[in-house]
């Protein structure tokens, strides 16, 4: 009797062990498959995020360069109109000169802060809007004036600065970008020369760059001159306080294209675009932290998906292991019934065989 009970317990353990082994194998295969697929999916998504961020930045830089070029072309056309259609065309003492000079300003006052014509000694000849020049102002010492005298064939673009030439009763400060050029002047019978000055409103550039930075989600864009001087930066306030640094001098040496650089131990992608005629550069920066944040968000999604999938497969594997081990359990029950003196037949259901086989004990 004890021997029969011992044999019964042994068979029960065998059945249990077989089901456990089947379930363990299925779980191991499932776990390895899910982890491998999750890792591959994560790596693929990480590469896709990196490429997408850089690709989007390249597209933004390209479209912004086109827009800035278009705006600056408009300003240059205003400058050329002032030079060739007014200064070169009319005597500076004529009413027609004053009329056309004023009209040109009025038509383009949304883009330019002022128009001015100076003689070769720095004397103010004409200005729009009409303004009183500040006392003791050294016009010839201004960068825009010196640049115009040093290279007389070119239109020179200054970096943004506060206009400081004229009195303003309201004490307003106007940020401008000065365009200047050495020009010939008609002054009666006496030919002369001087410097034509067009002060473009800084907002023409600032508004464009502010717009793309406001919607960039961590990626930022700034503009520098050919020698690395800052024209626009979204974090200029922090830079003025010493809370943020930008290596604009190094960036000024980059040619147009995309670069992978390391700054303070952090990797970042830099996209460089050239602004026509001025020598300025528009630079888009994709910090590593931006890509890391996006990847971390996806990492949580992957982890949650894997956990849900594992719970579903765990239940599925349990059902499959029960199904596979069912013939063995049925055989065990048949043997137990036979040993207990019940049925004289042992029922055996073979896997993959639809018709059961009965083994009769002789």
Predicted regions and their residues:
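Extracytoplasmic/periplasmic ligand-binding sensor regions of membrane-associated signaling proteins
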Residues: 111, 126-199
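Extreme N-terminal signal-anchor transmembrane helix of membrane signaling/transducer proteins, especially
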Residues: 1-47, 51
């Amino acid at each position: 009797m004890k021997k029969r009970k011992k044999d019964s317990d042994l068979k029960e353990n065998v059945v249990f062990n077989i089901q456990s082994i089947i379930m363990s194998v299925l779980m191991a295969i499932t776990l390895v498959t899910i982890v491998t697929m999750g890792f591959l999916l994560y790596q693929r998504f990480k590469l896709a995020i990196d490429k997408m961020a850089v690709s989007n930045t390249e597209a933004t830089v390209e479209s912004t360069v086109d827009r800035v070029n278009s705006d600056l072309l408009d300003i240059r056309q205003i400058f050329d109109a002032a030079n060739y259609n007014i200064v070169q065309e009319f005597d500076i003492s004529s009413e027609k000169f004053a009329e056309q000079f004023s009209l040109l300003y009025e038509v383009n006052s949304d883009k330019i802060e002022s128009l001015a014509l100076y003689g070769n000694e720095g004397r103010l000849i004409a200005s729009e809007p009409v303004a009183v020049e500040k006392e003791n102002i050294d016009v010839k010492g201004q960068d825009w004036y010196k640049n115009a005298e040093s290279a007389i064939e070119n239109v020179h673009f200054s970096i943004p600065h506060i206009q400081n030439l004229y009195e303003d009763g309201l004490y307003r400060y106007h940020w401008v970008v000065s365009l200047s050029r050495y020009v010939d002047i008609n002054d009666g019978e006496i030919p002369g020369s001087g410097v034509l000055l067009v002060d473009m409103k800084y907002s023409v550039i600032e508004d464009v760059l502010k717009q793309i930075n406001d919607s960039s989600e961590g990626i930022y864009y700034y503009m520098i001159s050919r020698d690395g001087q800052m024209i626009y930066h979204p974090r200029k306030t922090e830079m003025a306080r010493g809370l943020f640094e930008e290596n604009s001098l190094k960036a000024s040496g980059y040619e147009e294209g995309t670069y992978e650089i390391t700054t303070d131990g952090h990797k970042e992608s830099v996209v460089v675009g050239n602004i026509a005629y001025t020598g300025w550069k528009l630079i888009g920066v994709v910090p590593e932290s931006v890509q890391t944040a996006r990847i971390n968000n996806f990492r949580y999604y992957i982890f949650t998906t894997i956990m849900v999938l594992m719970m579903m497969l765990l239940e599925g594997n349990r059902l499959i292991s029960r199904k596979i081990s069912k013939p063995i359990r049925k055989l065990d029950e048949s043997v137990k019934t036979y040993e207990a003196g019940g049925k004289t037949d042992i029922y055996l259901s073979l896997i993959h065989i639809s018709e059961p086989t009965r083994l009769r004990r002789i």
